[in-house]
Amino acid sequence: MPIQVLPPQLANQIAAGEVVERPASVVKELVENSLDAGATRVDIDIERGGAKLIRIRDNGCGIKKEELALALARHATSKIASLDDLEAIISLGFRGEALASISSVSRLTLTSRTAEQAEAWQAYAEGRDMDVTVKPAAHPVGTTLEVLDLFYNTPARRKFMRTEKTEFNHIDEIIRRIALARFDVTLNLSHNGKLVRQYRAVAKDGQKERRLGAICGTPFLEQALAIEWQHGDLTLRGWVADPNHTTTALTEIQYCYVNGRMMRDRLINHAIRQACEDKLGADQQPAFVLYLEIDPHQVDVNVHPAKHEVRFHQSRLVHDFIYQGVLSVLQQQTETTLPLEEIAPAPRHVPENRIAAGRNHFAVPAEPTAAREPATPRYSGGASGGNGGRQSAGGWPHAQPGYQKQQGEVYRALLQTPATSPAPEPVAPALDGHSQSFGRVLTIVGGDCALLEHAGTIQLLSLPVAERWLRQAQLTPGQSPVCAQPLLIPLRLKVSADEKAALQKAQSLLGELGIEFQSDAQHVTIRAVPLPLRQQNLQILIPELIGYLAQQTTFATVNIAQWIARNVQSEHPQWSMAQAISLLADVERLCPQLVKAPPGGLLQPVDLHSAMSALKHE
């Protein structure tokens, strides 16, 4: 058989094999088109489980007459126009395949009118070449799609359809999922002329609770724990059922949405299951309704024919974020149980801490960098301080079990800061001849050394060594402990018996250094670290610190601070002039003894006299 171009109808029927699995698939695609059109009311009429009729009517923006024929063509869409649009898609549909595919396996009629048009127009495709016919019609502003005799021309597909009741149950489930995703839209579902479901648009929390109860049932509502969790561009909200009271009936309630799109994602399910594993039996599953919002550039929705799955660019970050959000609400279950009217508003923001594995590279700053980043802590007499990031609008969540009262007070103190941190106070440049000044930075040599001029002499200063001394000063407690910075996602590590014993022995000293942890039989969970360690890869640093402690017989805060200062990774592989000047200003302020008596390896005088002599000519 020679190579040939397939007829349009056959090509669309092949595509329909992926897009149109059953009547519920048709309903999903068409209702999502209505939502993309801005509809606030969608009526779904079904006959004989969708095999005879599927009618979707909405009050959206409608389709212009000249675009009706294109709407039924393959790969024609108003959702995207370039690859950039595809990589940051926010609409539910975008491929332009649904209407063409559905039209190829049914008798489809599209009727629409825009607000600018005086009359409506109707379009339908027929024949081998799928020629589109357009004619006038009567219709209000919006769109109606009628799908008659689904799979009438593909008997093999029609043979695999289930009973009328089964197919309608699948449609009912799709509408339930959409109703949970869009509380602001009225959805009416009818079957064989009878109204079966009516979900009115709601806005208030109490009304949302009633819709949640209508869809998921009263037992779920009674056990639901509200979640509101945020970190950078990630937001998690919704409800999870208390695992201690989860029944077999509740385990069927597993609804997850990514940027408003219904999902069945294994990564998300695994994170939720892992957070609940200590409270669930071997044969139990968590029950949840969760909404994940993420930067559209960081998620690929074009990885599944039916768009049931997505791929996250930073999957580990998303997994740990969801895990910690669910785990935190389970630990606070006595305070956050529904009904919603009886609980305090959930916090809109949480402190922006970095995850243990590193920084969030795609977080978009909400304000200028100088205002967003916490200022360098001011130290007086060796005592440390500093603030811990953005303010939580609703305050820090209730202390997790195992935390002591004073630890909760530290958390609250960290959050009682302005929503926008004040800009760091400018550090006055050091004056030449000052008794506590290294001098003036002339240039950077070799990427990690600063060439200094002071009192007529030239010296070379090692910036990594100066940074290490500064870290040690920042980590050494004075009259009060170093301020701890809570981690958004605590670091959980498996430890040996010797390592656990060493940690317990050094726990009070580590607390003075701002390192807070909890331990159980075989694991230790790092809950907070001092500010200088916020940007470090804690998954490497903390195990090395535990190994160091296990080898020691006695402990001292100075020795531990020295070890940490030597083993932290520099944030500046290549130093700039501005970074060097800022570092020296901090060192002069916090470590004045280094100016008076520089330790070995910090400063090296440069003898220019011999070089100058060589340049002199008789």
Swiss-Prot record:
An example molecular function term from Gene Ontology annotations: mismatched DNA binding
Record region (Disordered): 367-402
Record bears the keyword DNA repair: yes
Keywords, in A-Z order: DNA damage, DNA repair
Annotated PROSITE patterns: DNA_MISMATCH_REPAIR_1 (PS00058)
Cellular component, GO annotation: mismatch repair complex
Ranges annotated as biased composition (Low complexity): 367-381
Compositional bias segments (type: Gly residues): 382-392
GO biological process: mismatch repair
Keyword field contains Membrane: no
Listed InterPro entries: DNA_mismatch_repair_CS (IPR014762), DNA_mismatch_repair_MutL (IPR020667), DNA_mismatch_S5_2-like (IPR013507), HATPase_C_sf (IPR036890), MutL/Mlh/PMS (IPR002099), MutL/Mlh/Pms-like (IPR038973), MutL_C (IPR014790), MutL_C_dimsub (IPR042120)
Domain of life: Bacteria
Protein task: This protein is involved in the repair of mismatches in DNA. It is required for dam-dependent methyl-directed DNA mismatch repair. May act as a 'molecular matchmaker', a protein that promotes the formation of a stable complex between two or more DNA-binding proteins in an ATP-dependent manner without itself being part of a final effector complex.
Family note: Belongs to the DNA mismatch repair MutL/HexB family.
NCBIfam families in alphabetical order: mutl, PRK00095.1-1
Full protein name: DNA mismatch repair protein MutL
Biological source species: Salmonella gallinarum (strain 287/91 / NCTC 13346)
Gene (UniProt): mutL
